[in-house]
Amino acid sequence: MRDWYLGLDDPLTLTLAADFRLSQPDYLNDHIWELEPGSGDPPALLLHTTYGLRARSMRIFPRFTASGATVTAPASFAAPPRLRRFYPNFLSLNFSPFTGVEVLAEYWIPASQTIAGRLTVMNHTNQPSEMGLELCGLLVPIEGQSLAQVQIQSANVLAGRTSDLAPVIFLTGGPLHGPGPYPSLTLDLPLEAGASRQLAWTQAALGEPQASFELARRTAARAWDAERARIELVNAAQTVEVQTGDPDWDAAFAFSQKTAFSLFFPGNERLPNPSFVMARQPDHGHSMRGDGSDYPSLWSGQSPLEAYYLASLLPGAGELAEGLVRNFLSTQEKDGFVDCRPGLAGQRGRWLSPPVLACLAWQAYQATENEAFLAEVFPPLLAFFQAWFAPAHDRDGDGVPEWDHPLQTGFEDNPAFNLWHAWAQGVDIATVESPALAASLYRECRSLIQMAEKLGRSEELEMLQFRAVALRIETEECWNAGSAMYHYRDRDTHRSLAGKALAKRRGSGKLKLKRSYTAPVRLLIRVQTKDKAFRRLEVTIKGQTSSGAQAELIKRQDVQWHMENAALTSREVYTQLNEIEVAGLEPNDQVTISTVDYTQEDQTLFLPLWAGIPEERHAASLIERGLLDTDRFYHPFGVSACASLPCPPAETICLSVQMPWQQLIGEGLLTYGYYSEAAQLIARSMNAVILNLKQQHAFYRAYHAERGVGIGERNALAGLAPLGLFLQTLGVQFLPGSRLRLSGKNPFPWPVTVKYRGLSVTRRSDQSEVTFPDGRTVALSDPSDTLVCPE
């Protein structure tokens, strides 16, 4: 494994959590820690947690004393901390608190309720050294007591209580209680010239002090070197090492894999295989109800788009992607329905999963070549695909289904369908046909066709090929040459009209409109109240439809509310509007009436490119006039979620860069041979990632397209560096049996070396060199499309 040398100004993210590959993390009671080298309070080499918000804070840090001087802050060290190794549950750092004295600090989480550390102190001078160590602990409880210096079974420890936990800190070597300003355990460390000394500490937090003490003492007695070797072996077997011409990129890709692995929990009776959470931070991991049903959305189930992205981040762990597919399919019902958010506590999203599961399964198969897996999942995936064409989802029966809820789209904040913000349109998504859904179904269909061909399932092939042709035609009908974009269209009229404001008023009453339309329109009525009090809102629309006079009543139970905002979409489309009556409002409530706007542009409308639908001419126009337009989508830090910014409050949504969507868009660029553009997109995204890893020591859920600053949750899955897209753009795919597929050539500005399980490939601008685990090398001229085998 690579030996790093990362300082505080380099890309870093130092969260620690129990690793599901090496232990059994507790989904309901999981303690997550983060190392803050110098930026915490006090400024120290500070480990901190909140035990999932059961304490205001718990902090552990060392203090060093020599020749009457005491240092705590890394900025005061003779040599600042340098990160040498990092894994999901392990960190090691080197530093020198004083000149000539080096410390190797290791941190390890062996299980969810404990953390351990080991300090190796080395005297590199030619004189004896007298140094003192204090291990300090600061607990700010919510309910309970701060850490106190106590004895348990004649051992000096620090113990406290917060909520239902009784944390205990234990230090080997027979420490005394420290005299300093913080609760601490202290040891004298006399060292001869060239000598070293090693000691370990542990913290455990169970329900009672005695149980915590016993767990801490047992953990301190574990064989550190053997445990570290095991950690390194497991990670070496599943991690891809990347060496580019930019060490910041290398670190970002390595931290992305570390973080991605840390998001997994083992399967249980609710989900049969390991599943993931969206982020794993010190404030997470505690279920007050004790069953996980109260967890927020970040911990409430695996979602399909994030599962697809996560699989691309872990090219060395294809079996995990197989397990994610099986988890989704474990929720399947007789009609083919598969839930969109199955969770480890039995959570369900209650909506049909978006059609990316066959794509995920095919991606997993390409990594593992496990044909038995394909044979197992093909029938249920086919049933799932067909479920999308049931009348409940294809309401007009035209073969182009509609989304049921914005959650399914992977872009829940889409302003076209977002109810939560007054500035968003908020139309009922079930009244809209989206080229993104049609394209996803087409791509799903193509994946099923590939499976059927591999498995020799000729009976299903004909039906799938017919579906694929129909979906492609319908998606292309959404193409708008003038804007060089695909557009949404109305479910019933199949038209993509621009929206128009019709009227405004305050409070209940009638609006006389007297408007006629050549092309039928659908109405959108938005209400903004002055307070959060419930309104018995009802709306009556009178006008003409294609079937004659119509009086449509929208009852209060059909109105969608969020805080002070409500949005109502008419069920009918109208050729003439006569009168709209609004009832149940207060006098100062604002009512706005408009026709639905189908011309709003967002990142989901690039999915036809990902699916490989447009012909070359349309694809070139979509890429060059749409995607790469700097006045619409293309920004210094990536492709923005929306083409325009309706108002300043919309900035964090419309100008956000979301990595799963960069992945899909980048894959679309590669499909049409735009390798240089894909490399540039990766570079822009990486600039945002690295900026935040350096300044904030964290990934973020999204990034600002113009400024690069992080948006949303820290260290979220959706903000990890796009390793999968990078490898695809580089043209490197590792296969079982030390085999390697190379395609194209290196479009990046420097040579790139990628290593996996002893296999190494270096891609330069015009040639590649492959080194097998036995040392044999093969040189190839690029561009190439070659399967490289060890024999």
Language-model region placement:
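Terminal accessory carbohydrate-recognition/targeting modules of carbohydrate-active enzymes
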Residues: M1-A254, A503-V596, M686, G710-L720, ...
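Short secondary-structure capping/junction motifs at helix and strand boundaries
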Residues: Q127-G132, A321-E322, T368-F378, F389-V400
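Secretory-pathway/luminal and periplasmic proteins that interact with or process carbohydrate-rich
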Residues: E143, K334-V338, A387-D396, I473-A484, ...
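The feature captures the catalytic groove of carbohydrate-active enzymes
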Residues: P190-T219, G292-P296, D335, D339-V356, ...
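Substrate-binding groove/exosite segments of carbohydrate-active enzymes
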Residues: L233-E376, E433, T599-P614, A620, ...
